[in-house]
């Protein structure tokens, strides 16, 4: 299911690291609605867990201009959250319904949209947020790299296994159709202290691609997202 949240920025701007702002909002909503569920999802034995979470999201702006550290937003801000988890869907929908504002974001509407189904073992998708793939050395992979499909399969297998207890039923075959490189600039807690750099850059890709694999896998991945940092606003996809 997809949850569509619309709103506006009261001060007409949002940090360039808006994905982190939206993730913080999502975590706050889950925590306020069900603290034990939040602890189960984001912590293990009192410590933050790196375990993948069953959701992804994308953000869209109307009438905006990107500056060095901020995005000036005159129009609507739309957040699209996707998850195959029924409980999480309920928690997020009810939480957003109760929420009036978060920081400078003022909510105007919330609605649920049914997912379209993949009917065969292949489909053409579009990205709603950029896909980020890295190798075993944490190096971002170019889409032309011979290991791109291998690593995409690796991360898809992890997210499926985390959600349903087992991974891919069949290998995925990713074919770019009309993809372009997108460099995403993020300000992440702890990164500046370690590197003395304010921003980290993610080389990712947006556009249209063909994906072949098991039909059930494709339907779940459409809701879970693909690649790395899905829970931080990357890898959200939909049927074209």
Feature-to-residue mapping (PLM):
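RNA-interacting cores
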Residues: 1-240
